[in-house]
C-alpha cells in the first residue's frame, strides 16, 4: 500500500500543479514582446511542467523553427503579439501529444477565421473541467486496483495503473490524429 499512498500524494501534487500552471488571458502581457521577453515569460510561467529543472520549455531556435515551418505566425517587426503568445501556449500543450505537422493542420483549419482569445478562453474553461475528471478517474483506478485481490503487490498495481493511463492517452491521441486526418482530407478537396 505504500506505493499507492505515494501515488495519492503524486496525484494531489499533480492537481495542484495543473491548477497553478494555467496561464489565464489576463496574465498574458497585453503588449508586443521581443523574442527574449517571450522566452522569459513562457519559460517562467510553464516552469511547473519541467521534469528536470535544467530543461527549457522554449528556446529561440524552437520558436524560429515554428515560424519557419508556419506553425506559428510571423512576428511583426521582430515583436510577438499577445496572440503569438497564445499560439505558443497552445503549441506547448498540444506538442506533448501531436506532431508539429498535425498542429499546423489544426491551426490552419481553426485559427484563420476565429478569435484566438476566445478560443484560448474556451480551452481553459474546458480543461479546468477535464482536469477534475482526470483526477477523479485516476482515483477510481486506484480504488479498483487496491481492491483487486488478484493483484498481489504494489509493483503490479503500479504497472497496471500506468498501463491504463497510457492506454487511455494513446486512445485519445489516436482519436485526435484521426480527426486531424479528416481535416486534412477535407482541406485537400
Label the model's feature ranges:
Residues 106-109, 113-189:
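Intrinsically disordered, low-complexity, charge-dense segments enriched in Lys/Arg
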